């Protein structure tokens, strides 16, 4: 069995292009690990590879979920497990690529078996979050999970809301579930991960250019189609990078210029958070700072050859 190659990195760092070239070189297949690229309605806004870019390389778990659904990490993990089993039977290389670190952690470290939160509790916590903010959530969570409430402070409203809704639904701390992880799909020795860490200044400029290109390529039309469906703004697809700003423009709440600047700013902030995540969650993954695909290929094959000697000829 060939070890799977995992590619992670911040938004706009060139993950998809690299994954496609790796899969093409190895005769392998690409598996998506980006939580927004699973949605069929977000071709442009999620920067999902186009049909032309994917040509000749089989791709999996891209654009197959409706934006009206809450698609969980557990659902993705089971879908990825199915694809990986088939590729292993066929002795094919798997290149798993995406900016959703939680997906990659679940794949390689296991996933906590947290029961689904009922919609009425989700709605209750959402109302608290909107009316009382992170301060209110922290105060409500503190009596039940003081350690997590202290660690999160008021800087992560989404995680505070998640921890509080889990406690309301189960009466247990989120950390209890996290300490009861299922066995990972990919065990030690069955995968190797690489983190793309291009220079930040250049990356931020690329983020700005890419978003400007998205506006030209149909991002507004995608947002308009979703706004017309009156979907819950708290759905994951409606919170994709750039979507809230473009949706506000579609509704006439802000100008096109304001939408563009807001989306660019949030994308840069998100990239910064992804760099932080990589440092904390993947401290031992080899870093590849070069933005050039050829350099990245050489680094990956040099290391990959040490654990898998088949089909890893030099990339020139």
From Swiss-Prot:
Binding site for ATP: 9-16
Claim: Metal-binding is one of the keywords in the record: no
Interaction with substrate tRNA, as annotated region: 34-37, 158-162
MF annotations from Gene Ontology: ATP binding; tRNA dimethylallyltransferase activity
Obligatory cofactor(s): Mg(2+)
UniProt similarity note: Belongs to the IPP transferase family.
Site residues (Interaction with substrate tRNA), renumbered to this chain: 100, 122
SUPFAM superfamilies, per the entry: P-loop containing nucleoside triphosphate hydrolases
Gene coding for it: miaA
Coiled coil: none
Protein name listed in UniProt: tRNA dimethylallyltransferase
Binding of substrate, residues: 11-16
Assigned keywords, A-Z: ATP-binding, Magnesium, Nucleotide-binding, Transferase, tRNA processing
Subunit structure: Monomer.
UniProt-listed HAMAP family: IPP_trans (MF_00185)
């Amino acid at each position: 069995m060939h070890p799977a190659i995992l590619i992670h990195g911040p938004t706009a760092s060139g993950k998809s292009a690299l994954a496609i070239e790796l899969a093409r070189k190895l005769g392998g297949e690409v598996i998506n690990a980006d939580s927004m690229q699973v949605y069929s309605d977000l071709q442009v806004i999620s920067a999902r590879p186009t049909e032309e870019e994917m040509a000749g390389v089989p791709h999996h778990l891209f654009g197959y979920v409706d934006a009206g659904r809450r698609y969980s990490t557990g659902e993705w993990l089971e879908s990825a497990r199915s694809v990986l089993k088939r590729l292993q039977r066929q002795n094919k290389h798997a290149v798993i690529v995406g900016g959703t670190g939680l997906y990659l952690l679940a794949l390689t470290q296991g996933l906590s078996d947290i029961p689904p939160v009922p919609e009425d509790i989700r709605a209750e916590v959402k109302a608290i979050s909107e009316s009382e903010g992170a301060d209110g959530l922290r105060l409500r969570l503190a009596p039940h999970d003081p350690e997590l409430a202290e660690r999160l402070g008021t800087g992560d409203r989404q995680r505070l809301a998640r921890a509080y809704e889990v406690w309301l639904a189960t009466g247990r701390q989120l950390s209890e579930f996290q300490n009861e992880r299922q066995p990972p799909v990919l065990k030690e020795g069955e995968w190797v991960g690489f983190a793309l860490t291009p220079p930040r200044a250049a990356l931020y400029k690329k983020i700005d250019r890419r978003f400007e290109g998205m506006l030209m390529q149909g991002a507004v039309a995608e947002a308009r189609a979703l706004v017309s469906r009156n979907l819950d703004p708290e759905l994951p697809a409606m919170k994709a990078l750039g979507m809230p700003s473009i949706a506000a423009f579609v509704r006439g709440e802000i100008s096109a210029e304001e939408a563009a600047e807001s989306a660019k700013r949030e994308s840069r902030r998100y990239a910064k958070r992804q760099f932080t995540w990589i440092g904390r969650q993947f401290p031992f993954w080899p870093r590849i700072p070069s933005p050039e695909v050829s350099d990245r290929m050489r680094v990956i094959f040099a290391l990959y050859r040490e654990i898998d000697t088949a089909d890893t000829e030099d990339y020139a």
